[in-house]
């Protein structure tokens, strides 16, 4: 009896089982990488909004506000000129299930409007911003002199 070269059924089943095991281990780490990427995108998007508000307040020599609403956060001048169209200059949209919370530690009252001001000198009110969404959560302290973020909490899901 001559033996044919090839794989037996047991060897094929064993190879498929090992492949499925490796795939099962890779999928959770892949979802973690995707969640981290999405969380980083939200942090970068908000930091871009902050940078644009600061740059415009200095360039136009007038205060700018970052204003919170339910589904978005916008940057706009504090006061519009008479001939100026009333619209936001930059926007950070929030997806369903995402929450962006503003805390102003130097505010005179506990209940303050959800507005963060940038003055024409380039300084801003010190702020703590917290984000929570499906991809994870982050928190950042923004320095009053530079308006740059120091990330204090970053946890992808």
Please describe what each predicted stretch is.
Residues 1-30:
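N-terminal single-pass transmembrane signal-anchor helix
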Residues 2, 25-48, 55, 59, ...:
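N-terminal helix-rich module
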